[in-house]
């Protein structure tokens, strides 16, 4: 998903069929300014928790041509909302290994998806 999409949980909602999730990883590429980094830091782990999936967010670092500051905070979270990687304000690359078996084990022990109400969005 892209940038501002992080604010809309329904767009990221994992869909389940016969106990299988549509995805195991949410990935956000973003340009969130420093003024809103608190929301970025709160919403990214929330999406991981509510969708029983990993969530990775890559956010911009630096100052743009309009003098707007971007502080990064690129991070990876597991399905429990625990931070696996936090790059803070650094402009760098880091590798993270995600465990599918840990994810599947957690989903089987905590099958919250079974309680989700199916719904559709009308245009």
What name fits each language-model region?
Residues 6-93:
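CN hydrolase (nitrilase-like) catalytic-core segments centered on the catalytic cysteine
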Residues 9-11, 96-97, 116-117:
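A short, polar/proline- and glycine-enriched secondary-structure boundary/capping micro-motif
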Residues 17, 36, 104-123:
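Cysteine/selenocysteine-centered motifs that mediate thiol-based redox chemistry or coordinate metal-sulfur cofactors
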Residues 44, 98-99, 114, 121:
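Residue-level signal for alpha-helical context at structural boundaries
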Residues 92-109:
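A short, polar/charged loop-to-alpha-helix boundary motif
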